Amino acid sequence: MELNKYIDHTLLKPEAKSKDIDKLIDEAKKYNFKAICINSSWVKYAKEKLKDSDIKIASVIDFPFGAAITQAKVQEAKLAISHGASEIDMVMNIGKFKDGDYEYVLNDIKSVKKVMGSNILKVIIETALLNEKEIIKACQIVLNSGAEFVKTSTGYSYRGASESDIEIMKKTVGDKVLIKASGGIKNQESLKKMIELGSSRIGTSSSVALMENQEIKKGY
């Protein structure tokens, strides 16, 4: 199993500086990770640094809350793609979802996907804030949205992905939508387990430690 090819090497801290992005990129090149995942203001910078690499750039939008108006999400996605991102990780509108306004949530996702062309969209449903029935419903919405991935977590709630999250999500989406497990992965054994349960991508800021088979004490 080529673990590196499952990993989105992630740096989403608001205080991240150019030297931190440089370090992220150097690590991604060294381990040949599938992608880096960064905030949208760094996409153009990272694209220049990765111009001779096949490592993908994933940009988060309206992160970490997902509570902005749809037009703002659409505009940020368009700009991130124009700057060099080929993948977008968006947060669904959790408040609207909790209100039962599923049509709004669906249209919010569809509107972003509509301006992305063939680029990949991952939808973060923030499983830590949902019960089992809500996880199922959120996955069903993502299924109908045209997005390529459903993703567990932002890393900013009280926990990241759990094995039970992935089991519920996989049972709901089958092979129709891919799954990204993010946060909460503390060792290589846990990483492998998430993949075995059905995750096609892993989001973590501790990618290097995981590749070196170290135990993660803190971090996303």
From Swiss-Prot:
* Protein's GO biological process: 2-deoxyribose 1-phosphate catabolic process; carbohydrate catabolic process; deoxyribonucleotide catabolic process
Q: Cite the SUPFAM superfamilies for this sequence.
A: Aldolase (SSF51569)
Q: What class of enzyme is it?
A: lyase
Which keywords belong to this entry?
Answer: Cytoplasm, Lyase, Schiff base
- E.C. number, please? 4.1.2.4
Q: Which GO terms describe its molecular function?
A: deoxyribose-phosphate aldolase activity
* Catalytic site positions: 89 (proton donor/acceptor), 151 (schiff-base intermediate with acetaldehyde), 180 (proton donor/acceptor)
Q: In which pathway does it act?
A: Carbohydrate degradation; 2-deoxy-D-ribose 1-phosphate degradation; D-glyceraldehyde 3-phosphate and acetaldehyde from 2-deoxy-alpha-D-ribose 1-phosphate: step 2/2
- Cross-referenced CDD domains: DeoC
- Please state where this protein is localized: Cytoplasm
Give the CC-aspect GO terms. Answer: cytoplasm
Reaction catalysis annotation: 2-deoxy-D-ribose 5-phosphate = D-glyceraldehyde 3-phosphate + acetaldehyde
What is this protein for, i.e. what is its function?
A: Catalyzes a reversible aldol reaction between acetaldehyde and D-glyceraldehyde 3-phosphate to generate 2-deoxy-D-ribose 5-phosphate.
Recorded family membership = Belongs to the DeoC/FbaB aldolase family. DeoC type 1 subfamily.
Q: What is this protein called?
A: Deoxyribose-phosphate aldolase
